[in-house]
């Protein structure tokens, strides 16, 4: 796929995304080799499209490409943690959670991620409540 074709497809895909036509946008996204794309924002948008369609593994894979290009991004790490849980990979979610708390030790979103992990692990409700109470502080 040449640059012109890539540009046309991505513009059309983003227009469909803005209109809320995520299924059609995902069909266009499937035609592009995202490993060659360096634009982090584009990769995050594609990940959003796949996530809205319930294609969590594709969303996770594309977001992982963005992570490799911008390793210090709290937003990407947070979303990777959530997507890892949605794909049933709790161990990876814990790894991303640890990365997130190292990068942003004072970010209150860490408590939401902790709660999501505890919930996925079916931890006692007291522990889950404790994580949410920490967020509330």
Language-model features, listed with the residues they occupy:
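Alpha-helical segment of the N-proximal tetratricopeptide repeat
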Residues: 5-35, 45, 51-52
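Single-residue signature of alpha-solenoid repeat helices
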Residues: 25, 59, 93, 127-128
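Canonical positions in the second alpha-helix
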Residues: 31-32, 65-66, 99-100, 134-135
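Canonical tetratricopeptide repeat
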Residues: 45, 79, 113-114
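Register position in tetratricopeptide repeats
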Residues: 18-19, 52, 86-87, 120-121
């Amino acid at each position: 796929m040449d640059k012109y074709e890539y540009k046309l497809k991505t513009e059309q895909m983003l227009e469909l995304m803005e209109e809320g036509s995520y299924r059609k946008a995902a069909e266009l996204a499937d035609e592009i080799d995202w490993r060659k794309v360096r634009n982090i924002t584009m990769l995050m948008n594609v990940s959003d499209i796949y996530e809205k369609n319930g294609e969590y593994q594709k969303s996770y894979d594309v977001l992982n490409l963005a992570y490799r290009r911008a390793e210090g991004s709290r937003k990407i790490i947070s979303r990777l943690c959530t997507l890892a849980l949605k794909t049933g990979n709790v161990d990876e979610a814990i790894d991303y959670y640890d990365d997130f708390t190292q990068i942003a030790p004072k970010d209150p979103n860490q408590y939401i991620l902790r709660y999501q992990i505890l919930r996925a692990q079916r931890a006692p409700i007291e522990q889950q409540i404790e994580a949410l109470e920490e967020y509330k502080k």
